[in-house]
């Protein structure tokens, strides 16, 4: 066993002595040592229940004849961090999580790992670590939150609260109505109830094969999640016995399948960023052109909030992720069904008995929302290395208009609230990319303000930053190269005409190459917003969004 490095041989007597101080007995040194990588944090509702959850995982690991050791990672609640300096720390926290998990697990030579993530950057951070460490691993997330209901019976979620702010600001609802939405938008523990980033990543984790069937959709408060815990411990033991590791599971084909589900469900645009980072950790050469190829062959079968009033509980009721995959598998060339997963079985075996139980929630191949996926990769002179739009969250497929430029999210939100943005405008929020932000903050507050004011179909928004999974409308993010790197978005001037064509996958500014070259020569990079601390280091090390915004390793040659 891998853990023999710290427990076998006469020279490991000091190690065993220390381990006995934690409560271990001599007989425990013949069992696999399992890292329980938890993320219990009281300020994050998606993680509030994970302390008790971790206890159940440890019980299941002991029952399976293994020895559990629990530790916790950090985490950032993107909703609470939204709209202020806290959002700059969100994406960088992914790297800290990956590094911290790698540190604990490799320092102590664990034989296997069960990861308990739930919210936005915690899930991809742990997945990156699992691929980096590459020991048998099973993920079992904390589960989605239920949707809420206002006193009038209206179904609401976190995106409803954000949009309620814009609606109140524009006089569309009263302060009492906003308070009603606020009080009921997040009714329980769990990851926010729509197809936002957390649930998108937990669903993708299931499809990749690192998590068990049901992981993405079973609610946090559902007793079936306890059964999932027990099964996770049993399956981990099998993975250890068969030496099946994350890099055996997360192949290029598995990533294709993860993006295929993403396209079928219209997941968060953040999945592109995180899954490219996973490919990097797995040592795979996977780029945005391959994502676009998946988008072209996968129909959009589900619309989940913010694209509709359906939530994760409805997906679960309709058959879960397995039912969506089973329906997708009817179309030749969409899924790779014979690859191994954390169950020890193939994807084909995992979904064999799944079926759609509600075709209003999960559409059939014969009745898709659209023939192509709910995410699109756009390119053009404004995004030479690519940009991403959640096409399933807008009915508008082509938009052209003059740009209104803001050099930060705060500046943009203030401008929107003051009425500086009109119908037909293209809002540009720049210098918010991985380097420029720094940290590539999400633009949920501006998109929600625009939607809440009733301009969601009449105003487009472009940024080198990110969007929350709760964002909707004509929102194009991840524009690469970013402004801080001298990308075309940095060269835009007030009133320039921008064209967004979703069907043609085009993002262009209507000015000549000669004019762009002239502006590029005159452009000067602004001073970094942050020069010290973690964010200062991050800004110097981070790469572009089109490569997953991973950190570059210095060249020591």
UniProtKB/Swiss-Prot annotation:
Any single Gene Ontology cellular-component annotation: cytosol
Chain segments annotated as transmembrane: none
Active-site residues per Swiss-Prot or TrEMBL entry: 468
Binding residues annotated for [2Fe-2S] cluster, in chain numbering: 119, 192
Enzyme class: lyase
Subunit structure: Homodimer.
Name recorded for this polypeptide: Dihydroxy-acid dehydratase
